[in-house]
Structure formats: C-alpha cells, structure tokens
Amino acid sequence: MTVRVAINGFGRIGRNVVRALYESGRRAEITVVAINELADAAGMAHLLKYDTSHGRFAWEVRQERDQLFVGDDAIRVLHEHSLQSLPWRELGVDVVLDCTGVYGSREHGEAHIAAGAKKVLFSHPGSNDLDATVVYGVNQDQLRAEHRIVSNASCTTNCIIPVIKLLDDAYGIESGTVTTIHSAMHDQQVIDAYHPDLRRTRAASQSIIPVDTKLAAGITRFFPQFNDRFEAIAVRVPTINVTAIDLSVTVKKPVKANEVNLLLQKAAQGAFHGIVDYTELPLVSVDFNHDPHSAIVDGTQTRVSGAHLIKTLVWCDNEWGFANRMLDTTLAMATVAFR
C-alpha cells in the first residue's frame, strides 16, 4: 500500500522530507497529500525549489491556487492555525509528519488524531507520555500497531545513539560526555538583536555560541542505565548545515583505537548499513552536506587514552540525514499498523 502523508510545518525539515522522498525513489511507498504551513504558497514553492544548503531541486515545482505541484503530483496547501481544523479525515491521511518544531505533546498528537489522522510522527523530541520515541536503526522494531503518537527524536540523538549502542555492546560504557558542534539555526540572529537567551542575541555568523541542549536526557531515554552518567554541552558554529559530535566514553573493557575503528567500520558495512557510515578520508564539514546517513564516524579522529577512555568524532547532515530517517520511521509505523 501507499502511505498517505500530510506535513504540518514546511520549514527546514518539512521541505527536506519532500526532497528526500523524491530523491530516494520512495514515491510508490509514500505520497504527500497535503502540507499545512502559515507562509504563502508562492514562498513554499520557491524555497522547495531553491535551497542554499542543498541546491536546486531536480523536480519541477509550481504553485497554483491552493495546490503545490512537484512534477505531476498535486499536493494540497493549507494555512490552518488550529490543529483541530485540519482536514485529515477528508484527505484520508495515514500519518501526519509534524515538522513545526513547536508541537510535541500528547495533546498535540491527539489533536491531529481527532482531525482524522491515523498516526502522528513528530520531527523533534516529544513529551515523555508519547507512545514511542524512535531512533531508526536502533529501536524501530519496538513499534506496535497501537502506537499512534511517535517522536523521531532529534538529529543529534539519531547521530549519537547508534554509536553509543555499538560501543556499549562491545566494551560496556561506564560514563560519557558529548559535545555537539552544531551549525547555526533559525532561532539565532543575523545581526545582534534581542533574544531571551543572551548568547543568542549575538550575530550567528560571527561567533561560536554555547547553547543549552537536552541531548543527555535524550541519551538516557534510550539507555536508562546511563542516568546521571552522561552529560552533554552544545555550541553553534558559523556554518549553515552539518554537525559534528565529539563523544567521549569510559568503558569497562580495555581497548585500542584501531579496535574501536574496526568495530564501527564493520557495523557501517553490516548491521547499521545505511544508518552509520565510516570514513578515514581527510574531510571537512561541507563534505557531509546532503549525506543521508544518521552518523558518519571519522576514523582519523578516534583516540583511546589509558585503554578505557574512548574519544570519537561523528558527523551528520542534521537536515538531510534526519529527513531520510523521518521517511524510514513513517514506513516502519505504517508497516506495523496497516499490514
């Protein structure tokens, strides 16, 4: 069957989901029937076609009245403020991809369900009372038909959780720290301007800016045994896409750097193929732009100190990789629900 999808919020992730759907050749499995976005349809069409990070979209894009066309495919455009007013029942929507970055509670999910959607997938971490939080490649097999309201976690969680799992399974993690080196985001300023977070009052292109992160909580959601044993900090840097994560863990078993690299390389070629990649090329952040993997391990940066402290550097395209995982999780939800 073809999963009928509606997208709520057509920002960075919403637009990349549409692009990834067409570029990955999965249109026989997923069709986008509607997009709800408060911005005007002409702007939606323009930003789908032309993207500073990802270039021109290969498909023809045009807008006619309340429809957006990608090639010959017509997508209904909505501008509803209220979730309760969305016509998901009328449109036969199977899964809503809520990409607003604003909604994430069970109440918000239930509003989509009340409007007629069968399932809801949030493109960001949700509240603890959601039916499931998925990092595709790690725990999607735990999805059940009764799971209606699901979170796809965050781009950084999708990046680091597979690597943590691999290291923990192999060597037994005792504790860890994570530093996220994240590209600038829309909640930062072009030039100095007011913001509740005083660090984010400063021009994004001129500084490395520390910001709050809930990544440690995201890690312990998947690995409760690490409660109070993982900490995370984050900085934003003056690039517009791609993120690096510096992961340091202490482990129970003694290990060498080449053994860590061999473990991660084999995983990239085997059980985590398509989710984790591995490289020893002398690459920089822009080289990972438009990479569909959740995580790319940079083997040249792996270090081991005292046989028990492992440091790794993991890259991800925080937009493109995550958009591809949204599609993967959508299909996983549909597979268990509609078979």
UniProtKB/Swiss-Prot annotation:
A single GO CC term, please?
cytoplasm
- InterPro entries from the UniProt entry: E4P_DH_bac, GlycerAld/Erythrose_P_DH, GlycerAld_3-P_DH_AS, GlycerAld_3-P_DH_cat, GlycerAld_3-P_DH_NAD(P)-bd, NAD(P)-bd_dom_sf
Q: Which reaction does it catalyse?
A: D-erythrose 4-phosphate + NAD(+) + H2O = 4-phospho-D-erythronate + NADH + 2 H(+)
* Taxonomic superkingdom: Bacteria
GO molecular function (one): erythrose-4-phosphate dehydrogenase activity
Q: Which residues bind substrate?
A: 154-156, 200, 213-214, 236
Q: Which UniProt keywords apply?
A: Cytoplasm, NAD, Oxidoreductase, Pyridoxine biosynthesis
Q: Please state where this protein is localized.
A: Cytoplasm
Q: How does it assemble?
A: Homotetramer.
- Species of origin: Escherichia coli O7:K1 (strain IAI39 / ExPEC)
UniProt protein name: D-erythrose-4-phosphate dehydrogenase
Q: Mind listing the GO biological process terms from this record?
A: pyridoxal phosphate biosynthetic process; pyridoxine biosynthetic process
UniProt site positions, description: Activates thiol group during catalysis: 182
- The keyword NAD appears for this protein: yes
Copy the pathway line from the protein's UniProt record. Answer: Cofactor biosynthesis; pyridoxine 5'-phosphate biosynthesis; pyridoxine 5'-phosphate from D-erythrose 4-phosphate: step 1/5
Q: Which Pfam families does this one have?
A: Gp_dh_C, Gp_dh_N
Root EC class: oxidoreductase
**Where is it predominantly found?**
cytoplasm
Q: Which family does it belong to?
A: Belongs to the glyceraldehyde-3-phosphate dehydrogenase family. Epd subfamily.
Q: What is its EC number?
A: 1.2.1.72
Query: Which annotated residues bind NAD(+)?
Result: 12-13, 318
